[in-house]
Amino acid sequence: MELPKDLTGRLYSERGAVVHSEVNSVIKTDHGKYLLVVKKTESLVVCCSVNSERYRFKPEESQPKILKSENDFLHHDSFVDCAQIFAIDVNVFLNNMSKGVFVPVGLFNEISMAFVLRAGQTCPMLNKVEQSYFK
């Protein structure tokens, strides 16, 4: 049984949800990206990208490794880039979910999410407001 799109959108706009975005919908790339929701407010859904490799020019501690063995929906072990966040208007996020621009992928388990939140709270590349999204 498939969930109604509005319910799916609300579920996948909460902390720990992972969605796949279409090419160039959030990040300018030649391929779609996995986005991890780290915070939802009344007006924003704050996300980080999930990558197959670490960025060499960013601190390793700001890119926690997430294991496929603990998150079955991942294709391989991955890295969350806590140093770059995307604050998306909540209505735009939900609209993108309903139109299929964002597609639900899965939910991070609690241990993986704890690693991400810790990395974001201490990330030296973020200001205090941005770090607070991870609390």
Predicted regions and their residues:
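Loop/turn positions that initiate beta-strands
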Residues: 9, 14-16
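C-terminal terminal-subdomain/extension
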Residues: 69-135
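A generic structural signal for ordered alpha-helices
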Residues: 13, 60-63, 94-95
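Compact nucleic-acid interaction/catalytic patches
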Residues: 27-72
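Short alpha-helix capping/helix-loop boundary micro-motifs
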Residues: 2-8
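Membrane-targeting and insertion segments and their boundary/processing signals
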Residues: 9, 53-59, 86, 90
